Amino acid sequence: MDVPSGENAGLSSITLHSPPSPAPPSPAPAPPARPPAPLPPGPDAGPGVAVRAQPSPGYVGGRVVVTYTVRNGKNALATGLRLRLGLPAGIPVATLPAGCAGGVCALPDLAQGASSVLRVVLAPDRALRTNVTGTLTTTGTDADRGDNVSRIPLRILQPRIVSVPEVGKPGFVTSVRGKDFPPGVPVELTWKPGITATAPPARPIGDGSFIAQLLILVKDRTGPRTITASGPGFSPVTTDFLVVGGTITPPDEVGRR
C-alpha cells in the first residue's frame, strides 16, 4: 500500500555493527636452548724418568757417567719439568749438565714421544756402595706419576794387586795377582827401581781378576822395589817386593801356583 510521504517523517535509520573478531592467541614461548654437551677432557701428558750408570761397577780413579733420560710417553705436551739429581754424597762430581743448580735441573717442554737426556760425570776416589736417584716434577698433567722417581744401586771398586811370593832373587819369576779391575782392559805391570822385562799387558777376566808374571833379570839390582799396575779406567795401584841376592831361597819358589 502506498504510504503517504508525510507518514515517513518520524522514521530514523539504525546502523548495525558486527562484533570484533577475537585476536589470535600469542604463540607459545620457544623452549630454552639445550646447553652444548661438555667437551671430553683433553689427554694427559706422561713424563717419566729413568737413570743408568756406566760403567757399573765403577772404579777408583776412573769415571762413571750417570745418564738421566726424561721422556713424555703420552698424548699431550709435558710442561714445567724439573729434575732433582740424587747423586751420592761420597763421590766427587767432575761435570754437571748446563741448566742445573743446587741439584735441580730445568728441562724444556716435551711433546708426545720427545725426550731430554742429561749426563753427569762422577770421579770416584774411594770404594763404596751407594745409590743414584732422579726425581721428576711437573706443573702440567701427568697420567702416571709412578715413573717420576728412578733409583739404581752403584758400587765403586778399588783395584789391588799382590805378589806371590813377595821375595825373589835375580832370575826368579814372581806371580802378580790382581783383583777388582775393569774386565778386559790392558793392565801394565812395572817395577821401580829395577828393569821391567818386556811382557804383554795382563787382561782381567769377567770377575776383574788376573794372574801375570814379572821376571827379575839375572843381573838386576837387589833390594826393595815397588810393583805398579796401571791402565785405563782406574788409578795406578802398587804392592811391595824384595829382590834378594846370594843363596837365599824365596819362599814358595818351588811350590807356588
Question: Where in the sequence are the language-model features?
Answer:
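Extracytoplasmic/secretory-pathway segments with low complexity and glycosylation-like composition
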Residues: 1-23, 27, 34-65, 73-84, ...
